[in-house]
């Protein structure tokens, strides 16, 4: 006897225990020895006991492949599972093969399975029922196809004449892929086995889950594959252009290959025994289904592609439901592994004639119940047609996570007359698939159809799945990131700021005081920074969010929205009425556009669909706070192989500095972190182009402590601690939604630096919320240049020393200076030092006194600490009293408005960003 190790694939649906979780411990991964993700422990009495075993290799979690994933990524995926998790594992199993002698004429063969003599038979557990209750055409397993022999190929069951050279290069057994088992050869002809499963009660399940795997059935002599000699007939295709082919339908595979643009990359697994290409066909007059082997659809799809494909409702089009036995909590990818169109394209013409020719239902043509039953499919899938009246008469349940189901039928409605019942799943309406639609989108689509229009519904009876869905209260499931601010509305309305992430569970949740869902609200759960779910409540739906975001932008534009203050409005109005804002009108008018306007310019929707992914590149690092310059220098000096400061370039139309996005990309290609010194608006830009920077903010303890820390770290630095401290306070107030992590600055130790390095290492390995949809090509083509509208906004939001006030109060009401001298010329640089200047006066560009250009710099724009007013030399003597009154008014209001920021200035006004002020 010869021993052979095979891999069996199992899928377990685990319910989360409040105390034990899922009851498993995992180890391994790409970053650990061995590489495979394995179950290292099973908690006794936990949800996984008896279902998973120690040593199981984890293949997939909730439809997310664990191949090449790190252990941290797998742990975070499991943490995001709220109630249930669908875990697919593969388990090694040893079988014994009868010893056979190798053929002397075939020295290249490595083991006894390669002999031509013996034939193969099914294992003893093969008769567990391949028919099941599946509606799948492309989701059938290899075991199912192995039981369907066809005429004309029975004599070739053991032949290897179609093998290509080198087919026996691998010595060991073939691992399982999606349920495929390599069967030992016996002296008995392999025969199909028919199994019939009959439900005694509606609550019973067939208990069969079908899978699929794409393989190479035939290689033409004139194609590139024949000349390449790297592919052979029977090879299992594991990846197509880097995308896993597991559970892909043939129609999805065809679309994937069509997008290859002349270059096709395949990762294959060699089938040395040529098992798949030598499956005996079923006899046409037998009881087995006469449907062709599923792999034959590949040639038909390539020869006669459909004339048109209906566009998906929002996301990439996926396949309809796979099986009536699917669990409602399974991953959408596993539930949608079959395809209606892939099984109907290959129908004979005599079967297609059953539907009227005038129907436009060509691609998704579904045969009658009788023909589907004859072909081995579920008899429940059928087509229903009726004219829409004033109402459809259907109540819908479910969502994008489980599918759309009928939860109620109005008596006497057209739908009731066509036999639609509670528990029917709606697969398609008027050529539009319903598999990926939320409940709100499905209802809006049906309500949007005009009365009198003919409706064509593809439905399937799934009462058992429907009742499971109702009991488990599942339906919609997707994640969003907010891009506007909303105040909480008690008792159940959640508030949020820009950048918050929510898990949406129901898109038609009843609002406060409503007994039935009327739309307008979503049930959502806030996701914390640790990827754990927090409080649950309702948020506005998509259309309502767009209205609120537009209203917020309009309010902030006039200075009455969130973040504005009455005092700042009064101060701005006071100076505006007296015409004393010298040369600042244009600047302040442009600088009204804050981050909300930037979000609108960046084409962010109010809600952005996001998914949790692991970064495949070194993310750029943005360090904000009063010691950012010191931290960047220390990182590049200590670890030059991991960090690099992004180079700045000058604008062509202004002396300001910018960083090109192409510079960030080049540094990432070097496998380094790009260190950036940019504005919050530039951070928004980086997030929009999906660079997802790690933003670390240093929180100063106090201004004296900050001054002592900078003198200890950089004694030669001449930067003003007053300005750095004020800048940090503004950043913390207006841009905290952009921070990835914060580090307090306490004392004069270097613990902040060690914590910074630890945060960067941790954040690089953690999964991040990324946009569900990729960027369009037009934006990627212009990454080397700043966005036009964004560049203008960024320039307005950067620091301009000419419009900043230099007065501060020390708590006693008096004015003092931190020793900074400013030039009030036309854009000249300012000096920012902690040494006191020779004169105890400050230059303020916002002062109402207009200086004559012929005056000396000492006299121009200065106010003596002991002099009440200064007469403008350009004014006539008759205006001295008016100027004196203005000076008196200014002095009277100075204390009142000293600490209030001008509403006309942006959140970034007054920031000292260094050479890189824009991105």
Swiss-Prot record:
Phosphorylated. Residues 791-801 have a biased composition (Low complexity). It is a peripheral membrane protein. Residues 92-173, 279-377, 791-886, 899-919 are annotated as: Disordered. One of its GO terms (cellular component) is plasma membrane. The keyword Nucleotide-binding does not apply. Residues 580-761 form the Guanylate kinase-like domain. Residues 147-163 have a biased composition (Basic residues). Residues 475-549 form the SH3 domain. Residues 812-828 have a biased composition (Gly residues). Induction: Exhibits enhanced expression in matured epithelial layers. Apical leptin, Staphylococcus aureus alpha-toxin and Pseudomonas aeruginosa acyl-homoserine lactone 3O-C12-HSl lower expression levels, altering junctional integrity in intestinal cells. InterPro entries: GK/Ca_channel_bsu, Guanylate_kin-like_dom, P-loop_NTPase, PDZ, PDZ_sf, SH3-like_dom_sf, SH3_domain, ZO. Pfam families: Guanylate_kin, PDZ, SH3_2. Residues 117-131, 332-360 have a biased composition (Basic and acidic residues). The keyword Disulfide bond does not apply. Interacts with occludin OCLN, claudins and TPJ1. Interacts with PATJ. Interacts with UBN1. Interacts with FASLG. Interacts with CCND1. Belongs to the MAGUK family. This is Tight junction protein ZO-3.
């Amino acid at each position: 006897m010869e021993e052979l190790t095979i891999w069996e694939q199992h899928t377990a649906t685990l319910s989360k225990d409040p105390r034990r979780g899922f009851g498993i411990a995992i180890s391994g991964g790409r970053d650990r020895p061995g590489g495979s993700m394995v179950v290292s422990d099973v908690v006794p009495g936990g949800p996984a006991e008896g279902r998973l075993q120690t040593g199981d290799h984890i293949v997939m979690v909730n439809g997310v492949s664990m191949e090449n994933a790190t252990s941290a990524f797998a742990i975070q995926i499991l943490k995001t599972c709220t109630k249930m998790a669908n875990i697919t594992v593969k388990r090694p199993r040893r079988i014994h093969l009868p010893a056979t002698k190798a053929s002397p004429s075939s020295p290249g063969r490595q083991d006894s399975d390669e002999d031509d003599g013996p034939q193969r038979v099914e294992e003893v557990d093969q008769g567990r029922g391949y028919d099941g209750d599946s509606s799948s055409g492309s989701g059938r397993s290899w075991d199912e196809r192995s039981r369907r022999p066809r005429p004309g190929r029975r004599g070739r069951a053991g032949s290897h004449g179609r093998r290509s050279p080198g087919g026996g290069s691998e010595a060991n057994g073939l691992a399982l892929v999606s349920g495929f088992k390599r069967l030992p050869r016996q002296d008995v002809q392999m025969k199909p086995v028919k199994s019939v499963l009959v439900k005694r009660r509606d609550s019973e399940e067939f208990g069969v889950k079908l899978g699929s795997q794409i393989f190479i059935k035939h290689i033409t002599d004139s194609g590139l594959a024949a000349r390449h000699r790297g592919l052979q007939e029977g090879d299992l295709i594991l990846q197509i252009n880097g995308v896993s082919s597991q559970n892909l339908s043939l129609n999805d595979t065809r679309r994937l290959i069509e997008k290859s643009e002349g270059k096709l990359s395949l990762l294959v697994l060699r089938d040395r025994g040529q098992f798949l290409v030598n499956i005996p066909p079923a006899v046409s007059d037998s009881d087995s289904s006469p449907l062709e082997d599923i792999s034959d659809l590949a040639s038909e799809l390539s020869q006669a592609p459909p004339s048109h494909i209906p566009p998906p409702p929002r996301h990439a089009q996926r396949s309809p439901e796979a099986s009536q036995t699917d669990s409602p909590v399974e991953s959408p990818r596993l539930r949608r592994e079959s395809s209606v169109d892939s099984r109907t394209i290959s129908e004979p013409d005599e079967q297609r004639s059953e539907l009227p020719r005038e129907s436009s239902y060509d691609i998704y043509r579904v045969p009658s119940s009788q023909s589907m039953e004859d072909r081995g499919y579920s008899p429940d899938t059928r087509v229903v047609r009726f004219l829409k009246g004033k109402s459809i008469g259907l109540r819908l349940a479910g969502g994008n996570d489980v599918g759309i189901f009928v939860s109620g039928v109005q008596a006497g409605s057209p739908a009731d007359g066509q036999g639609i019942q509670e528990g029917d799943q709606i697969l398609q309406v008027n050529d539009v698939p319903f598999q990926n639609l939320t409940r709100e989108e499905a209802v809006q689509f049906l309500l949007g159809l005009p009365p009198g229009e003919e409706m064509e519904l593809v439905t399937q009876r799934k009462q058992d799945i429907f009742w499971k869905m109702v009991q488990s209260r599942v339906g919609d499931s997707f994640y969003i990131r907010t891009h506007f601010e909303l105040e909480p509305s008690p008792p159940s309305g959640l508030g949020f700021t820009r950048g918050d992430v929510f898990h949406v569970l129901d898109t038609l949740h009843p609002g406060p005081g409503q007994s039935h869902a009327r739309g307008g609200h979503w049930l959502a759960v806030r996701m914390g920074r640790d990827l754990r779910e927090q409080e649950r409540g309702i948020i506005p739906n998509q259309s309502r969010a767009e209205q609120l975001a537009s209203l917020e932008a309009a309010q902030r534009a006039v200075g009455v929205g969130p973040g504005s203050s009455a005092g700042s409005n009064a101060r701005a109005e006071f100076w505006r009425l007296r015409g004393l804002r010298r040369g600042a009108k244009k600047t302040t008018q442009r600088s009204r556009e804050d981050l909300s306007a930037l979000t609108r310019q960046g084409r962010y929707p109010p809600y952005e669909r996001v998914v949790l992914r692991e970064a495949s590149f070194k993310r750029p690092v943005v360090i904000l706070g009063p010691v950012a310059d010191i931290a960047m220098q220390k990182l590049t000096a200590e670890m030059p192989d991991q960090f690099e400061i992004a180079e700045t370039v000058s604008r062509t139309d202004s002396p300001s500095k910018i960083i090109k996005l192409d510079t960030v990309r080049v540094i990432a290609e070097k496998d380094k972190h790009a260190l950036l010194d940019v504005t919050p608006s530039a951070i928004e830009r980086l997030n929009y182009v999906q660079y997802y920077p790690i933003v670390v903010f240093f929180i100063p303890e106090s201004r004296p402590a900050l001054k002592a820390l900078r003198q200890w770290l950089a004694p030669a630095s001449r930067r003003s601690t007053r300005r750095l401290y004020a800048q940090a306070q503004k950043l913390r107030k207006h841009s905290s939604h952009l921070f990835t992590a914060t580090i307090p600055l306490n004392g004069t130790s270097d613990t902040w630096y060690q914590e910074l390095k630890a945060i960067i290492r941790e954040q690089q390995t953690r999964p991040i919320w990324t946009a569900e949809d990729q960027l369009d090509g037009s934006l990627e083509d212009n990454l080397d240049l700043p966005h036009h509208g964004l560049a203008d906004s960024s320039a307005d939001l950067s620091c301009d020393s000419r419009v900043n006030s230099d007065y501060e109060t020390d708590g006693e009401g008096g004015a003092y200076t931190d020793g900074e001298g400013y030039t009030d010329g036309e854009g000249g640089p300012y000096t920012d030092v902690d040494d006191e200047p020779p004169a105890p006066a400050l230059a303020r560009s916002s002062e109402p006194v207009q200086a004559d250009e012929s005056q000396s710099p000492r006299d121009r724009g200065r106010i003596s600490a002991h002099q009440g007013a200064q007469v403008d030399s350009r004014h006539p003597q008759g205006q001295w009293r008016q100027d004196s009154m203005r000076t008196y008014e200014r002095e009277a209001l100075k204390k009142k408005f000293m600490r209030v920021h001008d509403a006309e200035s942006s959140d970034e006004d007054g920031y000292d960003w260094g050479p890189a002020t824009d991105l």
